């Protein structure tokens, strides 16, 4: 059904598309009317363009509907995108509620480059564990200064508003993924009006954004809207991506906000539609064991096969094994200390005791580990969980206690379980069942400041190359300082050239600097590019280091 609607909508918009006014590039004609963008010196921006009807009222907890309104006046595309309503981990303090429910927009950034008449397109999905984040959290000026690519940032529903699910056709879930899908369709249909090349669209994202890219690519019809994808620091194999106990959690959500009387999914959905959005999103607090743990209490699900417009109805592993996914080039990445994103908060000194939270793991490891590492819902008995928790602690820490001194091994555990192992699994599946090129790289070059220092609120600990250290060289982020070292400037330029070359390449090749990444499909060994301060090197591995 989604594929049929795709063909119909593509046909409509291709017939309707028009171009930028050559007399004034700030004005663009779209099927809904004329828009006015902003001149930012070295690039143009066209922000907050709606691609879907507001997901409010009866459209809450429903698949997104294409935007229908016709503008009689020129649409003001100079306002930055609003934040989708969320309980945001990056807000310190008790009240983390921010954003609005009516938020489904795309924002377009086009470089001023008179040497190019058209531009390849990067569709960007922000990260945030499917719970928080926004289109504005990652900058675009690095990419605009290079002057080679149009960037489109996508806003999508998050947390319970985007991913509540009862596991049946009545409240199927994955609304945030369906938002992304409709946004990609909008880009395909309309980007030529901005000077973009609809035949040269690549989708990129980081963390949950990277996992989103991968999930989009697991649909065979992805190839109709984009030609390649890059998943930085997250993919569909990560244990925090696919949720197995969404039904119970969604009914618990209903109980928290006053829908405890609901006896079935439809009654629950109707009740939730009547509640203020802020109450629903604020209920996230009740699912956290401590701090912001687990960091993803709501997220993607495997939908019921009879759900209308199901996004996926098989587990990603089974989809890949079936071969029924988009056979287009894909790249997947991880950082050597990705897990610092999850572990660093344990190094913050607590106001009440003056000591770090990591010491509390000595008394609460068996209680907290299943939530920290996302196996609470995948094991059937408490004994299974305790046995696995004990095994992990022994493997990574031996007989040592949790402390600041043992932090490095704790983050190593988090890196392996939450990121690295999933990257290895994804590559293993693709090299056996894929047909189009699949590439991988590992980044090992610590930033001076980053997410580790941000959450730990300290700089006296070596955090390594933490989650986002590579991505923020492409898309700026306030979690790291604004300045780049000379080696990072070179790496940033190489990343931007890599993305550009990947999307315009006719044969799906991928190059970083002077290194050509090697395809994993059909390979007996893992082909992994190592990127460090000193350059790049192709590795052939039996297993990940």
Swiss-Prot record:
It comes from Drosophila pseudoobscura pseudoobscura (Fruit fly). Its main location: secreted. Pfam families: COesterase. Changing residue 58 to D: In strain: JR50E and GB139E. The lineage of its organism: Eukaryota, Metazoa, Ecdysozoa, Arthropoda, Hexapoda. Changing residue 291 to G: In strain: JR50E. This is Esterase-5C. One of its GO terms (molecular function) is carboxylesterase activity. Changing residue 170 to G: In strain: GB4E, JR50E, GB115E, GB139E, GB336E and JR341E. The gene is Est-5C. It is found in: Secreted. It comes from the Eukaryota. Residues 1-19 form the signal peptide. The active site is at residues 207, 467. It catalyses: a carboxylic ester + H2O = an alcohol + a carboxylate + H(+). Disulfide bonds join 84-103, 259-271, 515-536. Glycans are attached at residues 113, 421, 507. Belongs to the type-B carboxylesterase/lipase family.
